[in-house]
Regions:
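Acidic, mature catalytic/reactive cores of soluble proteins
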Residues: 2-55, 59-62, 72, 80, ...
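Structured, charged N-terminal subsegments at the starts of enzyme catalytic cores
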Residues: 71-75, 85-86
Length: 938
């Protein structure tokens, strides 16, 4: 992150930086509908917590959602009162295409997985312009084939994708492009353009839908519902939607009524009406009653099944649609435009779509780095688009959810002691950034931290708001814990929130000026979170942490969320490393705040000292316990039994590299304004040298003095970076592997369990099996490593170099570190560290020729390039993310002009080939590629 001048003023930038009331109006409408609401914890009222079985895809068209709607290219107001989305039918499918289809864990060989082809093409932060592409097959959608074939496959097999079925062969599909453009903050235009890519004329039904989220059925008392009815506007059909007949939303301090809105359709559109109510007999069984004669699945029954009496002939209800059937010639297209605006709202006569699209071009031209290639600009823009499309109105009141509010179906009593029972305070009516709105349509705290770093490049206000919300009283637990994700809010994720707050603050400071109130309010709530971590996971008070799950789903031998048998505990290298990083970031925040309030100097001292205790504890645990293995030169988790015996888990994974992340530097000249902190610091350095020596060193360079605060000392740094830079260990052609490739030939075995290098999907179903940390490349952890290398470069004044290896000579069981100081003739002259008291002496290593080494910044730049190259096509048009040559998907994306510029941002990537795996729309943290392009392009 380098100092940059403020971004040039553009129309979109003006919308984002206007008066707060005007900015809020522009944000009122957006892509806030989920891609999937079925199968979520929010909609699960079962006794056993099996959300997938309780509300499957097959019931989604018939059952009213309680906590939020879904749809294709969905758009709604911020409280999801009035919703718009697109449904389609090709006259071949047995159901309307109202929502994206995917497999649940029991149907798939690697956990839940969407089986559709859609792409986020463009978006603006104000949502003044949005564009999405959905590829809709002309043949019958292969629902059963996808389920049957994936169910047949095992964990070692690749997933069977929609493209693999041959459904897109001969280009027999429609490219359906949905564009949304705002005339102003209150009026929306929707344009659907369907292109027939096939060789023959083909029919297509376009069914844009408008409906009210059901907020009126969850009380024992009758509540009047809102209404949608047919009207005529200048001879064209239209819908008048009015929510003033129903009570305002509960839980808000203001009235969120939308008032009367009109959705206008082109001539020739047929209007259909029903109610957003559950089809009782279909959902609950024969004899069950529906609250309305006209129910949620009416359009499916009318259009697909021909049931004319399924829809309301009175042309009124709480759900409506416009229906057009068209036949499109081969190579031709058809467009349909609609307008949604408050009743009587003035209309613009100019071409709003062209204006807004040009404004999007203008906005991103000011964002893209000047040295970025055309391909990098395409990658960055689609990553931003995916990030913005992934906003969602996340609605959940855990207190009501636990008790239930459907008077006809009270929830089972088991829920009182089950999932999230201790999170009754959590109450969200907020727009939140989702990891992936189909696969993960719920906020995940540590994912969100990375989202904000990317979001800050285009919308710092929203990024800061997201970070604050996780610390807001309606989210953060009174004990200080930050909620993890709805499957278990109490699970532990890596404590990266402080890092994200500090990074976003500085990005915003450079571009827009320091926002001290934001930093200060976050700092105070983060202190609560820090205290919670210390009290929760440092059971012996020795500053070595037992963090549990920590986000890396299957990286350990067993599920780290589970209690260990026999009273054993797992002392975790990554948990302790994360806490060291947390301490240092809090120290830096406190010093920043101390610029205007000296009281924060005492807090900076507290966090500095806590960092030292943590850093020293990793190397001076009681007895023979230590997380650092001097022989292997690596940090390992340690399994500790009540009888005092210890078993190191000799797994070379990210767990042992994460201690590198705990790195900051303090230049003496920085400390001059902070007299109290400087005195405390110097006293501690002098009088607690017994522990300071383990994790603080001092660098003298050209008369300047810098204190390097690093959990890893120089000896450990040598060993760890040698493995990071080794292609036979962590260095992949496409980034940083999550597990050393050495375990391909040398699996770690513990009892009946083992950990082996698996570069693709997981072969086991630990944590559901839909992600894998045993070999693949992940963006968030590599991003942090890149940042760590840059910090180390600055800390050691560019004197450190690391050898580059060709990956062909790999002595076992371990190698000496190949790491040199450029001032080798001075020994350690430039790095005058105190001697280490536990045998942490520098390993004698051969010095390779200079042409075979690089600086740490060079290694960071190389990692950034490798990560970006996952998405950059080679000379023949192949992107590594699409899989190896010869694979059906890779060939399609490489050679078909209607696919070649489209990008999926996968959850993680094959550690050997770079192929994208897991969730396919993880923008989400894979949008970090946009940050890498911003910082490292050219």
């Amino acid at each position: 992150m380098t100092d940059q001048p403020p971004a040039p003023t553009t129309a979109e930038r003006a919308r984002l930086t206007g008066a707060p009331h005007d900015v809020a109006r522009w944000r009122k409408w957006g892509p806030y509908l989920a891609d999937r609401a079925w199968g979520t914890v929010r909609e699960d009222y079962s006794a056993n917590g099996d959300a997938w079985s309780y509300f499957p895809h097959d019931l989604a068209r018939s059952k009213a959602f309680r906590w939020g709607e879904d749809g294709i290219a969905g758009f709604c107001d911020r409280y999801q009162i009035l919703c718009w989305s697109l449904a389609l039918w090709n006259e071949q499918d047995a159901i309307l295409k109202e929502r994206y289809f995917g497999l649940v864990p029991g149907e798939a060989n690697h956990g839940e997985d969407v089986k559709e082809c859609y792409f986020h093409l463009d978006a603006l932060p104000s949502h003044a312009y949005q564009r999405l592409l959905y590829k809709y097959p002309q043949r019958a959608f292969p629902y059963s084939q996808l389920v049957d074939e994936n169910r047949r496959r095992g964990g070692h097999d690749p997933e069977f994708e929609l493209i693999d079925t041959g459904i897109f062969d001969d280009s027999r599909y429609f490219d359906v492009i949905i564009e949304i453009a705002k005339e102003d903050a209150d009026a929306l235009l929707f344009r659907i353009t369907a292109h027939n890519r096939g060789p023959e004329r083909a029919p297509l039904h376009l069914i844009p839908q408008l409906w009210f989220r059901n907020t009126w059925s969850w009380s024992g008392e009758p509540v009047p519902a809102p209404s949608i009815r047919a009207i005529d506007i200048d001879g064209n059909p239209a819908l008048l939607a009015n929510d003033l007949t129903t009570p305002p939303l509960a839980g808000l301090l203001h009235n969120a009524h939308l008032g009367a809105h009109v959705l206008e359709f082109p001539s020739g559109t047929e209007l259909l009406f029903t109610d957003n109510e559950t089809n009782g007999p279909r959902v609950w069984g024969p004899g069950a009653q529906s609250k309305s004669r006209y129910v949620k699945d009416a359009f499916h029954r009318r259009i697909v099944n021909g049931e004319h009496d399924a829809v309301n002939p009175a042309q009124t209800g709480t759900k409506a649609c416009g229906w057009q059937r068209v036949e499109i010639d081969a190579g031709a297209s058809y467009s349909m435009t609609m307008r949604l605006a408050p009743s009587g709202h003035a209309r613009r006569d100019d071409d709003v779509f062209e204006i807004r699209r040009a404004e999007a071009d203008e906005f991103y031209d000011a964002i893209h780095p000047k040295k970025a290639s055309a391909e990098e600009r395409n990658i960055q823009r689609q990553a931003f688009a995916g990030l913005l499309w992934s906003k969602q109105s996340y609605l959940l009141d855990v207190d009501i959810w636990l008790d239930g509010d459907d008077p006809n179906r009270p929830p089972p009593t088991e829920r009182e002691r089950g999932r999230n029972a201790r999170w009754r305070h959590l109450n969200s009516m907020r727009i939140l950034s989702m990891p992936d709105k189909w696969e993960y349509p719920w906020f995940a705290a540590w994912d969100l931290a990375f989202h904000t770093v990317v979001m800050a490049l285009i919308d710092a206000h929203f990024a800061k708001e997201q970070l604050w919300l996780m610390l807001f009283e309606q989210f953060q637990h009174p004990n200080g814990q930050i909620p993890a994700y709805e499957w278990e809010f109490s699970d532990l994720n890596p404590p990266v929130h402080a890092w994200a707050v500090w990074r976003v603050y500085n990005m915003d400071r450079i571009r827009n000026g320091a926002d001290r109130p934001f930093l200060e309010k976050c700092f105070h709530k983060l202190m609560l979170n820090f205290t919670w971590w210390v009290n929760k996971d440092d059971r012996e008070g020795n500053n070595v942490f037992e963090g549990g799950f920590l986000g890396l789903d299957n990286i350990a031998v067993f599920d780290r969320s589970d209690a260990l048998p026999g009273g054993a505990s797992l002392e975790q290298s990554d948990a302790t490393g994360w806490m060291g990083m947390f301490s240092l970031v809090m120290m830096r925040m406190a010093l920043e705040l101390a610029r205007e309030n000296a009281a924060y100097e005492g807090l900076a001292t507290k966090f500095f000292e806590h960092y030292v205790y943590i850093g020293a504890a990793m190397k001076m645990m009681r007895g023979d316990r230590t997380l650092w293995d001097e022989t292997d030169g690596f940090f390992y988790d340690l399994l500790r039994f009540p009888d005092g015996t210890n078993v190191p888990f000799r797994v070379r994974s990210l767990v042992g590299l994460i201690p590198l992340y705990a790195i900051e530097r303090l230049e003496r000249k920085w400390l001059e304004p902070f007299a109290v902190f400087r005195e405390n610091f110097d006293w501690f350095m002098k009088h607690r040298a017994d522990i300071v020596d383990y994790c603080v060193s001092t660098v003298h360079d050209n008369g300047d003095t810098t204190h390097v605060l690093a959990v890893v000392d120089q000896n450990q740094l040598q060993h760890l970076l040698a493995r990071v830079a080794d292609p036979e260990e962590f260095l992949s052609t496409f980034g940083l592997r999550s597990l050393s490739k050495a375990h391909q030939q040398q699996p770690f075995v513990f009892g009946n369990a083992s950990v082996a290098y698996e570069p693709a999907e997981a072969s086991t179903k630990l944590k559901g099996g839909n992600s894998n940390w045993r070999g693949p490349v992940w963006f968030p952890t590599t991003f942090l490593m890149i940042e760590t290398l840059r910090k180390l470069e600055k800390a050691y004044s560019g004197t450190v170099r690391v050898a580059l290896r060709d990956g062909h000579d790999f002595p076992e069981p371990h190698r000496d570190a190949t790491f040199i100081d450029t001032r080798a003739d001075e020994g350690l002259g430039a790095v005058s560290a105190r001697p280490r008291r536990r045998g942490m002496t520098l390993t004698s290593v051969p010095v390779p020729p200079p042409e075979n080494t690089t600086t740490l910044t060079g290694l960071a730049a190389d990692l950034a390039r490798r990560m970006t190259n996952i998405f950059v096509p080679d000379a023949d048009g192949y992107r590594a993310s699409n899989g190896p040559r010869g694979k059906r998907q890779a060939e399609l994306f490489a050679h078909d002009p209607h696919w070649k510029d489209l990008i999926w941002f996968f959850e993680y990537f094959n550690g050997d080939t770079g192929e994208g795996l897991g969730a396919s729309h993880q923008t989400g943290w894979t949008a970090l590629v946009a940050s890498l392009i911003d910082e490292w392009s050219g």
